[in-house]
Amino acid sequence: MKKNYFHLTLLLSLIGISFLSAQDLTVEKMRFLTPHWNGERFEDGRPKVSNDILTRMKKVTIEEAWGVLRNEGYHNQFEGGWQPLHNDMPLVGRALTVQYMPNRPDLADQVIKNGKANGAIGNTNSWPIDRLVEGDIYVADGFGKIVDGTLIGDNLGNAIYANSKNGVVFNASSRDMEGLSDIDGFNAFVRGWH
């Protein structure tokens, strides 16, 4: 369990930033927000942490991680209260991060219109799935909503795993826990289950 919380903490603290909203971040803005990254980047500007590093991070303990994080000035980076799908499976990857505002008809129409104009298909919660690559984790802030805050079930979970070979971290709820549990290699940290 300690390793899982470390991996979640590290994920949320250090690896990649990208927001889905009415506007995506530009490559320039992504570079501005990640100035200390000197390595390769994805087309959208996200840091491309190597798969080798991601594999090695699965073996790092919380104690080791906290030492490094504190020495680098990362204090107060822990967020508790997660409900993992699998307690014994680490979740490590590059974050593709999105934020979902509470639904408002005046904004929702504009966001959907903009997304469709930019080639997005399906509902807004599926748009980031098309951008995932192997090693990514779909990280979504749904403002901790449990009721009316469900972002995925097992159908989208299968699509996420097909693209990323990884899982999700949702500050919101998910459903179809049984179906998601059947996806070999998929893990989720969420605020609640339906």
Task: Name these PLM-found stretches.
Residues 4, 14, 33, 40-41, ...:
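A generic structural signal for short, solvent-exposed coil/turn residues
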Residues 9-18:
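Bacterial N-terminal signal peptides
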Residues 20-22:
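Boundary at the C-terminal end of the N-terminal hydrophobic targeting segment
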Residues 24-32, 116-123:
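Phosphate-binding glycine-rich loops and adjacent basic patches that engage nucleotide phosphates
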Residues 25, 29-58, 65:
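Amphipathic alpha-helical packing elements
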